[in-house]
């Protein structure tokens, strides 16, 4: 993820208020907002109180909500995700940020069609977009392995959310996002937002360029 040197950031302690598990290894951590202002698409750096290990997470919640949320996948070799999984309401997080320039420009909000392409927990900033900007024209393509990785898909308009599963059948598309996109009709008013692993972003960007989408209409955020 890129840091935006123009961001106004701070470090503070925020109390955890809730944790909800979406699968065995993916959960949403909710904590006090503490007055933090952010733009949907930005990320914060999170770690436990008095712990040196920290990690970047896109904000999952909407900009008008009175709390902050992050979507976390437990990674076996990831110290921070393992620590966060063991948190309980009442524990404190050290939060630094926000950072980054990834997001939807205000002048594009209702004048463009927004195509969100995510892999795994890369859905996080798009969840924030949809929560923050009711009424925008959007379509989500969410690439996952299994159907149970369609994290809180009920929060999206079912006519606008398409699940692409690589390991099992899906009501939408069986196969990776990159298998479906070549047949997707591109229109001149579309902006493409990519968020997820580096391989997905590289392959999707290549597909879009082959479809004559200008580079300035492809916005990317790499998850690692």
Show which residues each predicted segment covers.
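Ferredoxin-reductase
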Residues: 2-91, 96
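FNR/FR-type flavoprotein reductase catalytic core
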Residues: 8, 79-224
């Amino acid at each position: 993820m890129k840091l935006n040197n123009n961001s106004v950031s701070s470090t503070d302690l925020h109390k955890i208020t809730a944790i909800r598990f979406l699968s065995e290894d993916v959960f949403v951590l909710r904590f006090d907002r503490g007055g933090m202002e952010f733009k949907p698409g930005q990320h914060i750096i999170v770690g436990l109180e008095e712990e040196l290990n920290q990690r970047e997470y896109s904000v999952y919640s909407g900009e008008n909500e009175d709390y902050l949320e992050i979507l976390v996948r437990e990674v076996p070799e990831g110290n921070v995700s393992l620590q966060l999984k063991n948190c309980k309401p009442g524990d404190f997080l050290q939060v630094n940020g926000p950072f980054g320039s990834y997001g939807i420009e205000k002048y594009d909000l209702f004048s463009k069609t927004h195509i969100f392409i995510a892999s795994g927990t890369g859905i996080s900033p798009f969840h924030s977009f949809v929560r923050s900007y009711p009424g925008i024209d959007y379509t989500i393509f969410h690439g996952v392995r299994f159907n149970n990785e369609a994290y809180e898909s009920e929060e999206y308009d079912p006519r606008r959310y398409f699940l692409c599963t690589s390991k099992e059948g899906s009501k939408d598309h069986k196969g990776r996002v990159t298998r479906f996109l070549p047949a997707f009709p591109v229109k001149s008013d579309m902006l493409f937002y990519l968020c997820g692993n580096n391989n997905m972003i590289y392959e999707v960007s290549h597909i879009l360029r082959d479809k004559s989408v200008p580079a300035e209409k492809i916005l990317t955020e790499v998850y690692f």
